[in-house]
């Protein structure tokens, strides 16, 4: 185990289209946080991996220097370096890992490879006193899954998407409607002004056993409606957005109810659901989820809205959680485009 003295961790996140660096302390203080969301992808309606990698190369060094300076620390004050090592876009991961390894080598400080999904999952413990075990729903641009969080580095998957992630479907629907990228916030805003009963969309897997998801049928149904619509005006966009959001809400309520029952059958002490990832910032979906969870005698917790999307703070906190367990990495680890959370293996 690592000493209980305050630890300072430098964190680097480059798994997708955010270049982020933070300096986080083990008493839950954020000493600095820099994040640059790459605007280059907007014109393409989604993330272009090569453009993302080049942007990380252009921004990461300066962002790291600025974050260290803003924290009031120098490299000698840093106790460890935490870096996202997967899952994600391999080009960006390589750049972040190379930077972290260089700093670790020069300073002789320990390095911690962080699973991106673990970072999203454990962030809640920075803001709430929540003990293990608990249930988590990760809903983001690349992932959609339920897991039981037994401890740091110990996860059990209950269900996941069989096709698209939820954030991916939001982006694709927004692209069909020429709304721009990222699609989630725009669709949420449009849906507020629409009629959720205007169009019927299929609720895949609803009322079936388990807590897997399938969103490809919804995407196809929206495309068919858009293709057959003669006039795509603002009223149409608001109504299809509202119908889409309502459909997603129904699916989440059904799948969450099943996941709660499944988790309690495994461990009756589980009574909290954490919802995290970029889509967890959607306030309309939060309202649906919160009602459902309360009806099932559970408590639901969300990270701060601004930290639902990728950021360095979550990587730094995951580093601190791992460091507290004595989990550090050798310099020979490699970034991984795929890294299921339940496959994590730790060594101290």
Curated annotation (Swiss-Prot):
Protein name in the entry? tRNA N6-adenosine threonylcarbamoyltransferase
User: Where does it live in the cell?
Assistant: Cytoplasm
Query: Which GO terms are recorded in the biological process aspect for this UniProt protein?
Result: tRNA threonylcarbamoyladenosine modification
Gene Ontology MF terms: iron ion binding; N(6)-L-threonylcarbamoyladenine synthase activity
Say which species the protein is native to.
Ehrlichia ruminantium (strain Gardel)
Function as written in the Swiss-Prot or TrEMBL entry: Required for the formation of a threonylcarbamoyl group on adenosine at position 37 (t(6)A37) in tRNAs that read codons beginning with adenine. Is involved in the transfer of the threonylcarbamoyl moiety of threonylcarbamoyl-AMP (TC-AMP) to the N6 group of A37, together with TsaE and TsaB. TsaD likely plays a direct catalytic role in this reaction.
| Alphabetical list of InterPro entries matching this protein | ATPase_NBD, Gcp-like_dom, KAE1/TsaD, TsaD
Sorted alphabetically, which keywords does the UniProt record give? Acyltransferase, Cytoplasm, Iron, Metal-binding, Transferase, tRNA processing
């Amino acid at each position: 185990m690592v000493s209980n003295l305050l630890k300072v961790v430098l964190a680097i996140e480059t798994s997708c289209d955010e270049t982020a660096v933070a300096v986080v302390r083990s008493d839950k203080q954020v000493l600095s946080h820099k994040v640059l969301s790459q605007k280059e992808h907007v014109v393409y309606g989604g993330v272009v991996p090569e453009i993302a990698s080049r942007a990380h190369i252009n921004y990461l060094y300066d962002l790291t220097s600025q974050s260290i300076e803003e924290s009031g620390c120098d490299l000698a004050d840093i106790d460890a370096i935490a870096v996202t090592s997967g899952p994600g876009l391999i080009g960006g991961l390589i750049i972040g890992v190379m930077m972290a390894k260089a700093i670790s080598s020069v300073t002789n400080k320990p390095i911690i490879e962080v699973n991106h999904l673990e970072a999203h999952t454990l962030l809640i413990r920075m803001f709430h006193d929540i003990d293990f075990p608990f249930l988590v729903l990760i809903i983001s641009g690349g992932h959609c899954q339920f897991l039981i969080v037994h401890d740091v580095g110990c996860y059990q998957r209950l269900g996941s998407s069989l096709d698209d992630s939820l954030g991916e479907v939001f982006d694709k629907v927004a692209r069909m409607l020429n709304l721009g990228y990222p699609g989630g916030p725009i669709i949420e805003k449009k849906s507020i002004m629409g009629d959720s009963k205007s169009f019927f969309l299929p609720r895949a897997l609803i009322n079936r056993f388990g807590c897997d998801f399938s969103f490809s049928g919804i995407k196809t149904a929206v495309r068919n409606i858009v293709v057959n619509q003669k006039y795509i005006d603002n009223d149409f966009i608001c109504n299809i957005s509202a119908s889409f959001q309502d459909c997603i809400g129904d699916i989440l309520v059904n799948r969450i109810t099943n996941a709660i029952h499944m988790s309690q059958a495994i461990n009756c002490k589980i009574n909290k659901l954490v919802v995290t990832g970029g889509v967890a910032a959607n306030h309309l979906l939060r309202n649906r989820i919160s009602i459902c969870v309360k009806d099932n005698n559970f408590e639901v917790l969300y990270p701060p809205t601004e930290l639902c999307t990728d950021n360095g703070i979550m990587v730094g906190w995951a580093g601190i959680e791992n460091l507290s367990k004595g989990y550090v990495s050798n310099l020979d680890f490699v970034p991984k485009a795929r890294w299921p959370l339940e496959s994590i293996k730790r060594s101290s």
